[in-house]
Design a protein with these regions (language model features):
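Positively charged n-region of N-terminal signal peptides that target proteins for export
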Residues: 1-5
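Bacterial N-terminal signal peptides
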Residues: 7-17
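Boundary at the C-terminal end of the N-terminal hydrophobic targeting segment
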Residues: 17-24
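Mature, soluble, non-transmembrane domains
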Residues: 24, 37-39, 70, 79-140
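A short, Trp-centered hydrophobic/proline-enriched beta-strand micro-motif
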Residues: 26-42
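A short, compositionally biased
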Residues: 32-35, 57-58, 114-116
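Residue-level detection of beta-strand-connecting loop/turn positions
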Residues: 44-46, 124
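N-terminal, post-signal-peptide region of Sec/Tat-exported proteins
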Residues: 48-80
């Protein structure tokens, strides 16, 4: 009996020591919808609001809108090609050099969300992205 308990203990130890796979925070099934409390902080200000992402057949559509319902950012993420397309940006951010940085950072943020990490910090431009999953935010 004692040998049996020792073998179970050793087996459990090895199972618990295996690296665990982080759960993706992106929508995974067709039509799945995920909502985040989103904050983008820059030196000159910040954007905050709700980000909704919906999984389509080949891409993930995302929209970031503020507390007043004004859409600040619409984008499409193509996971198979690792590309971001900005579909709509508010006037304040609608400059080629800002959109270039935004696309690069959103792509990195999507990679982080896929690994279960909900933040990204751009060291060069000092921009912080925080996407916190809202409770009961996943709909299928």
């Amino acid at each position: 009996m004692q040998k049996f308990l020792i073998s179970i203990s050793i087996s459990l130890f090895y199972l618990l020591a295996l690296p665990m796979q982080a759960q993706s925070l992106l929508p995974d099934t067709l039509g799945a919808k995920v909502r985040y409390e989103a904050t983008i902080e820059m030196k000159s200000g910040y954007l905050s609001g709700i980000c909704v992402m919906i999984k389509n057949e080949k891409d993930i559509k995302g929209c970031l809108f503020n507390e007043f319902g004004i859409s600040a950012l619409d984008f499409t993420y193509f996971p198979d090609r690792k590309k971001i397309k900005l579909d709509g940006v508010i006037k304040m951010l609608n400059k080629w050099y800002i959109k270039k940085v935004l696309k690069k950072n959103l792509l990195q943020l999507m990679d982080n969300l896929q690994q279960g990490i909900c933040t990204y910090h751009d060291e060069k431009y000092k921009i912080n992205y925080n996407f916190l999953l809202l409770r009961d935010a996943t709909e299928k």
